[in-house]
Amino acid sequence: MQFVSWATLLTLLVRDLAEMGSPDAAAAVRKDRLHPRQVKLLETLSEYEIVSPIRVNALGEPFPTNVHFKRTRRSINSATDPWPAFASSSSSSTSSQAHYRLSAFGQQFLFNLTANAGFIAPLFTVTLLGTPGVNQTKFYSEEEAELKHCFYKGYVNTNSEHTAVISLCSGMLGTFRSHDGDYFIEPLQSMDEQEDEEEQNKPHIIYRRSAPQREPSTGRHACDTSEHKNRHSKDKKKTRARKWGERINLAGDVAALNSGLATEAFSAYGNKTDNTREKRTHRRTKRFLSYPRFVEVLVVADNRMVSYHGENLQHYILTLMSIVASIYKDPSIGNLINIVIVNLIVIHNEQDGPSISFNAQTTLKNFCQWQHSKNSPGGIHHDTAVLLTRQDICRAHDKCDTLGLAELGTICDPYRSCSISEDSGLSTAFTIAHELGHVFNMPHDDNNKCKEEGVKSPQHVMAPTLNFYTNPWMWSKCSRKYITEFLDTGYGECLLNEPESRPYPLPVQLPGILYNVNKQCELIFGPGSQVCPYMMQCRRLWCNNVNGVHKGCRTQHTPWADGTECEPGKHCKYGFCVPKEMDVPVTDGSWGSWSPFGTCSRTCGGGIKTAIRECNRPEPKNGGKYCVGRRMKFKSCNTEPCLKQKRDFRDEQCAHFDGKHFNINGLLPNVRWVPKYSGILMKDRCKLFCRVAGNTAYYQLRDRVIDGTPCGQDTNDICVQGLCRQAGCDHVLNSKARRDKCGVCGGDNSSCKTVAGTFNTVHYGYNTVVRIPAGATNIDVRQHSFSGETDDDNYLALSSSKGEFLLNGNFVVTMAKREIRIGNAVVEYSGSETAVERINSTDRIEQELLLQVLSVGKLYNPDVRYSFNIPIEDKPQQFYWNSHGPWQACSKPCQGERKRKLVCTRESDQLTVSDQRCDRLPQPGHITEPCGTDCDLRWHVASRSECSAQCGLGYRTLDIYCAKYSRLDGKTEKVDDGFCSSHPKPSNREKCSGECNTGGWRYSAWTECSKSCDGGTQRRRAICVNTRNDVLDDSKCTHQEKVTIQRCSEFPCPQWKSGDWSECLVTCGKGHKHRQVWCQFGEDRLNDRMCDPETKPTSMQTCQQPECASWQAGPWGQCSVTCGQGYQLRAVKCIIGTYMSVVDDNDCNAATRPTDTQDCELPSCHPPPAAPETRRSTYSAPRTQWRFGSWTPCSATCGKGTRMRYVSCRDENGSVADESACATLPRPVAKEECSVTPCGQWKALDWSSCSVTCGQGRATRQVMCVNYSDHVIDRSECDQDYIPETDQDCSMSPCPQRTPDSGLAQHPFQNEDYRPRSASPSRTHVLGGNQWRTGPWGACSSTCAGGSQRRVVVCQDENGYTANDCVERIKPDEQRACESGPCPQWAYGNWGECTKLCGGGIRTRLVVCQRSNGERFPDLSCEILDKPPDREQCNTHACPHDAAWSTGPWSSCSVSCGRGHKQRNVYCMAKDGSHLESDYCKHLAKPHGHRKCRGGRCPKWKAGAWSQCSVSCGRGVQQRHVGCQIGTHKIARETECNPYTRPESERDCQGPRCPLYTWRAEEWQECTKTCGEGSRYRKVVCVDDNKNEVHGARCDVSKRPVDRESCSLQPCEYVWITGEWSECSVTCGKGYKQRLVSCSEIYTGKENYEYSYQTTINCPGTQPPSVHPCYLRDCPVSATWRVGNWGSCSVSCGVGVMQRSVQCLTNEDQPSHLCHTDLKPEERKTCRNVYNCELPQNCKEVKRLKGASEDGEYFLMIRGKLLKIFCAGMHSDHPKEYVTLVHGDSENFSEVYGHRLHNPTECPYNGSRRDDCQCRKDYTAAGFSSFQKIRIDLTSMQIITTDLQFARTSEGHPVPFATAGDCYSAAKCPQGRFSINLYGTGLSLTESARWISQGNYAVSDIKKSPDGTRVVGKCGGYCGKCTPSSGTGLEVRVL
């Protein structure tokens, strides 16, 4: 406590004053002990006093010393105590009022104060981020202070005109008014800022307020106005106009275009940000109404603000926000806007807040992202966030004149509703208000948008600069217009939710009272700054620096704060010095009268007139509320249709801009604008989008179209004030008139008739179908393809009556969908690329149309079906009342009557028309009949309340309603009470009697359930007992419900279920049909043994189809010729039945039809004699022709194959005729060769060189498989059986042999200068120094038989040089004969078999070169020319022409992964298609029947990294994920991998030694009682080795010392206390009276004893009786036992009990005790669940209880219901549970869509997905995963969406369950999809399941079925996605 230090300071001050001897001596106070801020204050004061306020009560009496106002702390008390600041030791209640007294300046001041929190929200919260720094130690030194209760407002000395505004936290801080002027008071602060808020008599400074003297100004500096529109600017070192700005919205209007902003605003429309509005509890309601708006604001102050303002920060910020709130209360804004601060976040450490730098744009972006993270649904919600910083923010590196920054129109966007403001003193409030204006979509007052509103000079809140002419308290007309339109258009829905009601009123105090004019200068220009004297007061605040008043007065053009004193008795208000108003009344606004309706917006076609009213009778003043209610109303005008030749109204508005190019690149000066309809978002339909004629580029030329403009081409709705409003075809606002099928607005379909027909005649070219007359409506034409394919060579066409084609003319067909405008009508065409080609239009056609069909190609018959409505001719029509209309509803639910409705009918076609047609005709009587005859209506008593008196007479209420009693089943159904109005309703109140007993029912165990399933009952007995378990009469327990019977086993029994019968397996004759039969329990299939086999339905039964038809062939007819070659015919008929009835040939199998023609040959003919002329026969044969079908697919996928088609002879009627009738015509080919793509061919490159240079070696070559373009392909694409050889033998010349002596090669020397270096020649002949020298013998010239050898012989001298004079006769031989053995000869074997039986085959034999001993030699060793042939032709005779090999299609690969093979059938076939033996085709090369193939990649186990050890010390486990995977990304089921090679997923690990934890017990506390047995406690904690306290779970629980023990002191004394007897419990018969009997402890010092419930054994003696019998008179009433229904079983499994109520009641349903107890029915019985308690509840229990180790489906008991769950990983210790999805992966999938629009600002095709979109498919995060099973956590009942073990990713990356997204468009056009279908699983999603959108422009559209089993969603953005909320997860429940 700091009282001593304050007392010392006060003593020193008093001593200093005494030494000075006068009041003026106060200036000589020891100021070195005061805070510097107060030192400066005292220096400016002419007089002041030091006082100590005293808190008093309302009578002026001092409070006790322990009562003092203090600043409250956030604690649990604040939740229950509305004013915790007042502490009292007594039991007096706290109050919101406070009274203080002080003496100063010779006067007594008595303060009467009332709490006043102003603008602070009831749940206002202050959040501190980080630890205060060294220089911030005084900022919330202990815990955050609650300032809401600090603010008080009241009056002085009982005079309400003498206002006081005081903050009572840490002393009295504020101002008050007296008869002699205004006073200020504040507590003294010491040098170190210490003060004691608990101290009562704290010294305060009190001083008068006087106007400062000022000197004239020397002049003003010029203001610099920047054109930059993006930021606010501020002063630097010289006077400068301050700039405010905004971030420009990308879609401007025409005014912005004309000002040159088109480049930025129209670079590409659609880049406009499409804000995602936060969905709040309020839905969009009616527009153009003024609603109260509540702007919940988060204010964030950075660490620089903390450093600058210190402990005063919160006060300062609340003062700023009070000014902002008052600005938004000004009536000039035209709306009721309430600014409410809900949260203040103070950032001590820079790292804990958003990144703040000098760059304003970056800071805003960082702050917006940061604040969104603080706006969680479960936390403190805010609508917008404001950042206050002392950081000098800049719009560029060298342009730091920015004061604030915000984006336009983002108030309800949770990601972008934020702004930043640089703190510059109290004028910061105007910056905050300005930036919030941008958030409300207000432009600057000098913006081109505002010129239309007549704002010529920016002088209001949204002025771009704050200068001398600015009025920052009021709003311009432009600002009012834009915020009103913004809110009326529905962009402020999040502001409709009102914060919780405030506990007290919130008036606003003026900031100038809290901050004097010098303090305002310091806040702007720093410490030491003071107001410049002699300047104009209030209008602008001029401040000087510390160097003197004449050296640098400067201003930021901000006015003095409201409430700043300017002259005696006056203060500043809105920049003017005005008299102080003592008690300004608050005036709420009220609506004025409606203005007359204005001019019509259109001259025809439905315009709008508008009337408005202003909030001006009166206007809101002095903080009053703005009007609430409708401000505009509309009515239709000029609704008559426009002339047909008049241009479209939207077209006229676009044409207004013809010739205006707005400086957009690429637009010509004569540009022409036309309306843009398609591709515009629904919410933008009332903006004027125009397209450049002849181009696709479009732009927004106006913010809104003219009122009355249709919203689109396909609707009657019209635009009003930029919103699409409902209108009818009569062009009247809010009309529901629609055109009937005849095109008549509001018609009854009676003015037209329907014309319908078909057309199927074919002729080449254009064929006329029908003429559609002018005036036709509802045209629908469809052309069905004959084969269901899109390509059938028939196309619809339209032409005008003049023959001009409108669609598909001149043999040019439109394949894509298109629209055709014919006058004012729009005709839609589906395009020719559809199986059903369609032309349709609902509009009235004003000209005649000719419908045609274009037939080309193969001239298939068209199938055209058309219908349209045409006006009825003007002849009179007859109408009559038809009494046989539909039955109307029954007049009553029971015993009522219903009648047929009379309908007006047209006689000509019996069409029902409007009743107006029959108005003047007499109506016949109604046809009636009784209805609801199977039930009755009566009043039903549903229930009775308990008796109002527990003892004696009372009453109870009855729940009575009108009920429908069914006579059939006796059920009761509640209906409206009005149906029972014919019967008097019984009273809902009846008398009753309380039994005055304290008894209760004691039950026996429930009996076993009477049925094991399908609902049985259980019973139990009930006995009435008292608290001592004494048995009482049952009448003593009638106040409690007796439950002795209950229902049990209410789940259904397993039942046989059967599917639909299949079709009969035969089409004729007798066959069978099948159906599935299974055992089902709920939604689950069980094993058949679970159902009764005796009742199993049959699964197969016989079926009888019509008798089968067969072919019957007649005898052959005569040969067609009398000689030579001819043919014979016979009749072939299709017959059926015993009587052999002839039926159509289509009823017989065409494949088995016998031939009806054959060749015949008679003797050859002799040449006929020449005849002069032959006469032509006049017989005309029937006209026949060959018809053929389409070719089948080629039998081979590559290379040569075959294809076939159906060929049939048809007569002129198209019926099948005998082929003989077409014999004279060439028969079309029915089978031919085909080739889809060439197969791969083997390509062999050149042989390599031989591997040796002599002798035998090997040569190799490369063999590749290439396609038709010679590109290398996989070898499996080529025939493996015909692969060329890749290596072969090769022979080189024989290798030389080495001699044993020299090792030199035996060949003659070729070089005459050769000189041996070593050995001497073998033979030497010497002559005169010259000698012959010989070389070695060469090889034998022949390898066999006789040959010769040669050697070199040379003449050399003694030196070895060549000489010429050697003796010739002794010259050695140069050649000699040699013998190498016998030569090899050609040997050959026998010829092999011929490769073909005919047509020229090949046969081969073995031919080798060898010696007689069998030694083989290369072929070159024998004479090649003599080599016998090793192959020759054979069987060269011609083969039959009608046999060939035929191949079937290749089978699928034999393996699903890895290498395998596939095969096909190869068979020999005759020309007529019949099969032959293979020998007939042996002469042909047989195609291969086998080939290699390769499946996908085989799944393999993939093990992840080991996790960290499960413990930080000791022995633990490590785990890793082991999954079955295909490739690197695709996840497979674990069953697809080999379970025996699965890597381990868990292993042991060893951590460091664990620390030792022990229990530590502290000292015992005092005993809880002063007498008798009590208890005492002590604290027992767990500590570590260092004696530090840790969590108790770390110590051994078994060794924990006791923390409680009994303590026994002196015995207590007790006494019996009895009460008065009650009245008798009954009015007749035997009853009893009661009284209270209590054992009470004797307390010392108390005169009276209290009733208590001490145990009775403590009291001495016998307990006095508490019940006494009584008898008043006999009861004449008889009674019977009545039983209720059995309750539910007490256990979910095993044996339990169930109960029912048994009551003794009189005939009047009154409780009685006259029933015979021996006849009482049982009230309690045992029950047994059909399933025993050993049913497993998870897969781990399945493994433990059943010993199962196989993965599969098992029944688990989940939340009381048996469900089928798939258990996976049963071989491991931790199996997992999965839910098998009954509807499979077709309805359970997740997708991240991969396409991205080239122009992401569009949403083409109205959001539909099209593969032909203008897209690129490059989104890297795309993927598609489908799910067969999903994992479930049975503990939390949550779906684990990221488990993909049973998911199949067919495209891209895996996508978690229930997740979707895309990167498709930024225009709310989601394409990513997910689907959940839990039907049949027994589970459904809970209501808490939520999805959140993430990413940029993220949007989601999620639809849930009512039962939660089905969810479908579309999500996306640019780029965005939706995932289940992490807060709620994907929780499921058991159905």
Curated annotation (Swiss-Prot):
Location(s), subcellular: Secreted, Extracellular space, Extracellular matrix; Endoplasmic reticulum
GO molecular function per UniProt: metalloendopeptidase activity; metallopeptidase activity; zinc ion binding
Domain Disintegrin: 509-587
Effect seen on changing residue 287 to A: No mature form produced
Post-translational modification: The precursor is cleaved by a furin endopeptidase. N-glycosylated. Can be O-fucosylated by POFUT2 on a serine or a threonine residue found within the consensus sequence C1-X(2)-(S/T)-C2-G of the TSP type-1 repeat domains where C1 and C2 are the first and second cysteine residue of the repeat, respectively. Fucosylated repeats can then be further glycosylated by the addition of a beta-1,3-glucose residue by the glucosyltransferase, B3GALTL. Fucosylation mediates the efficient secretion of ADAMTS family members.
Composition-biased stretches (Basic residues): 229-242
Pfam families per the UniProt record, alphabetical: ADAMTS_CR_2, ADAMTS_CR_3, ADAMTS_spacer1, GON, Pep_M12B_propep, Reprolysin, TSP1_ADAMTS, TSP_1
Domain GON positions: 1735-1935
The UniProt record lists the keyword Chloroplast: no
Bound cofactor: record note: Binds 1 zinc ion per subunit.
Biased composition (Basic and acidic residues): 217-228
Keywords: Cleavage on pair of basic residues, Disulfide bond, Endoplasmic reticulum, ER-Golgi transport, Extracellular matrix, Glycoprotein, Hydrolase, Metal-binding, Metalloprotease, Protease, Protein transport, Repeat, Secreted, Signal, Transport, Zinc, Zymogen
Motif (Cysteine switch): 221-228
Region described as Disordered: 192-242, 1289-1330
Region forming the signal peptide: 1-18
Tissue distribution: Highly expressed in all fetal tissues. Expressed in a number of adult tissues with highest expression in heart, placenta and skeletal muscle.
Binding residue positions for Zn(2+): 223, 434, 438, 444
Result of altering residue 74 to A: No effect on mature form production
A GO BP annotation: vesicle-mediated transport
Peptidase M12B domain location: 293-499
Annotated effect of mutating residue 280 to A: No effect on mature form production
UniProt site (Cleavage): 287-288
Entry remark concerning the domains of this protein: The spacer domain and the TSP type-1 domains are important for a tight interaction with the extracellular matrix.
Name the UniProt record assigns to this protein: A disintegrin and metalloproteinase with thrombospondin motifs 9
Species for this entry: Homo sapiens
Gene: ADAMTS9
